Amino acid sequence: MSCAEVMYHPQPYGAPQYLPNPVAAATCPTACYHPAPQPGQQKKLAVYSKMQDSLEVTLPSKQEEEEEEEEDEEEEEKDQPAEMEYLNSRCVLFTYFQGDIGSVVDEHFSRALGQANTLHPESAISKSKMGLTPLWRDSSALSSQRSNFPTSFWTSSYQPPPAPCLGGVHPDFQVTAPHGTFTTADPNSWPGHGLHQTGPAPPPTASESWHYPLASQVSPSYSHMHDMYLRHHHPHAHVHHRHHHHHHPTAGSALDPAYGHLLMPSVRAARIPAPQCDITKTDLTTVTTATSAWAGAFHGTVDIVPSVGFDTGLQHQDKSKESTWY
């Protein structure tokens, strides 16, 4: 062994740790005795050994450093936008894509559609079948409904039945008027009602149907009452028709001449025009004779006011007329 080789022996604290080999010491006179280092020195030695190990690591060459720098620059260039557009003070548009956008989009969609058809052909067929099933169901439903309609419904000669306009409102409502509800009677046969009518009454419609008989059909005495009312009050119509009753004609002039033979003598006398100077006299005589005649004719049917009271009322009325006339 050479003199540089030494043997390490673990020793207690304070004892020398490095002892020279006796054989080496005998052969090498330069070998000397060194005392063992302290614990602080041991730590320093450990740190020193680590520093040497780190220095022994091979450092990168200059070429490698340059390559790394170039790669970093390329990455930075990729991260930078290809186009920058200033929109406003708070918005700037950066465009990172380079190339033709339209061609890239077309290529993307064509590739996606091709993959969908090639990878999932069974799913596409099942979807098409699922889309057709509602049509089959609808066609079957239409065929079942078609069997419910008559054959003429599906041809051009089909005519729909008339819709009930009024019959569908209520089951008890009759669309057509029952037979015998209205009778087309001659309007001249109604006393007093034919005075202002120029033509026959219009035929009744379905909406104006009335299920109750007219008053003339219920009580036969209605016509007698109406005639009596006309012949009591209308003889004075020619006296004051110039004042406020100008739209009411006189009874004698408005009656049909066909009924002249049915009138009583007092009414016939009223039809003859009298001079203006004898108006009050003719009115008084006509009223008194008419009241006495009508009282005798309809004593059993209608109760009439006594002629005395009626005449006194008419005389009072005639006096008031005379005062305004003259």
Swiss-Prot record:
Q: Which domain of life is it from?
A: Eukaryota
**Where is the segment annotated Disordered?**
54-82, 184-208
Xref: Pfam families: Vg_Tdu (PF07545)
Give Gene Ontology CC terms: nucleus
Give its localization. Nucleus
Q: Name one GO biological process term.
A: regulation of DNA-templated transcription
The record ties this protein, via SMART domains, to: TDU
Q: Where is this cross-link: Glycyl lysine isopeptide (Lys-Gly) (interchain with G-Cter in SUMO2)?
A: 62, 129
Q: Does the keyword Transcription regulation apply?
A: yes
Cite the entry's keywords alphabetically. Isopeptide bond, Nucleus, Transcription, Transcription regulation, Ubl conjugation
Main subcellular localisation? nucleus
User: Is Transcription regulation found in the keyword set?
Assistant: yes
Coiled-coil residue windows: none
Q: In which residue ranges is the amino acid composition biased (Acidic residues)? A: 64-78
Q: Which family does it belong to?
A: Belongs to the vestigial family.
Give the protein's biological function. Answer: May act as a specific coactivator for the mammalian TEFs.
Which protein, by its recorded name, is this? Transcription cofactor vestigial-like protein 3
- Organism annotation: Mus musculus
Q: Per UniProt, what is the name of the gene that codes for the protein in this document?
A: Vgll3
